Amino acid sequence: MHVIFETLQRLSLARVISCTYVPLSNNALIASVGHDGDRRLITVNLKTKEWHQIADDDDVCQVSGDAMARLSDTSFLVVSSGTTTPTSIRKFDVARPHEDKVIRKATDESYPPTLYSKGEHFTIQSKGSPSRPIHAFLWMPRNPDFTAPEGHLPPLIINAHGGPTGRTGSGLDLRTQYFTSRGYALLALNYTGSTGYGRAYRNALFHGGWGVLDADDAAEFAQHLASAGRVKADGIAITGISAGGYNTLQVLTRYSSLFAAGLCVSGISELERFDGKTHKLESDYSAKLLLPQGGVDDDVKRKLYRERSALYHVESIKSPLVLLHGRDDSVVPVEQATLMADKLRDMGRDVGIVVMDGEGHMMAQPPSVRLWLEEEEKLWRRTLL
């Protein structure tokens, strides 16, 4: 199917290994479209070429991959989340909206909507080269039971997503709300190379940008928000998992003076070792991200990988750093964390490491999730407040 509507050209239907639309009838289909880092639901009339958004952002601003199913000519199921709605299975009926309902939520926890901070989509223009837009979502602190003392700015946690060809949207995330309800601002950095902003932005990290542009983007946002008086200049931290962990280490080697602390989860510290031991699916991914188009000889490749590996630049890290890693991680082997911790410890730096037995790459087991949150909050309390 090839549908061209002029008014839809600014939106993206593409999503890797996912079906982003479902025909309901001969004249109507439902689609999940991407724009400014989020994915929204629309209904499209194929006969009149008209379309409209089905739900507001509070209900649906993120749609899971390959997660729509037709029920009838007018109704369908979808897995989605909104700015104040957790990930849920929902039923929508485009002809009878009063029959829309939530079938099941991913969590049984319920909190008053007044407690939730909503993400503000943010775009700044880089000051560094190449000149480019940089995107993010910013959640400011919110808790109706507490007010910050006058003149006090909140500390900021910058979170870099994994991938690196991925993104973070503005859907409700209770981990984010955990920190915003405790007085922290949180920035989800959709650095150069993220999805959700068009092909040019997505491809801009390839062929030599990884480890430089994404790290620069974090520093640009830290400086921007501090200069604008929105966050505490000496209370900014960086964190991320997987490629976001790599970003964390790169940021601390390049811009340590800007960041009060870092938390690296399942991150890469030495690219050559990683390239030789990661799983088959991503075995050529690093080369495409790091090497110029057309390739280079082995000596140049080895030199470039070393330049982009935090393990060889630990002397630049002045900020406290905690590394979390699963012992059974098959994507980024645990030695990536232990090598980094050993080298920093030998230099007398403030470093901690937690290796979780029986855990893999994504830290998904409930005990690991709890320990991760505890270690993170402990670090921020010590370094940001």
List PLM regions with ranges.
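Non-catalytic accessory segments flanking enzyme active sites
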Residues: 5-12, 16-20, 32, 38-40, ...
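Structured core elements
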Residues: 20, 30-31, 77-78, 123, ...
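Alpha-helix termination/capping residues and helix-transition junctions
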Residues: 23, 35, 43, 83, ...
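Conserved loop/turn motif of beta-propeller repeat scaffolds
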Residues: 25-27, 73-74
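Flexible loop residues that form catalytic
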Residues: 81, 94, 162, 241, ...
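Cap/lid segment of the alpha/beta-hydrolase catalytic domain
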Residues: 106-234, 241-242, 276
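Active-site-proximal cap/loop segments of hydrolase catalytic domains
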Residues: 189-385
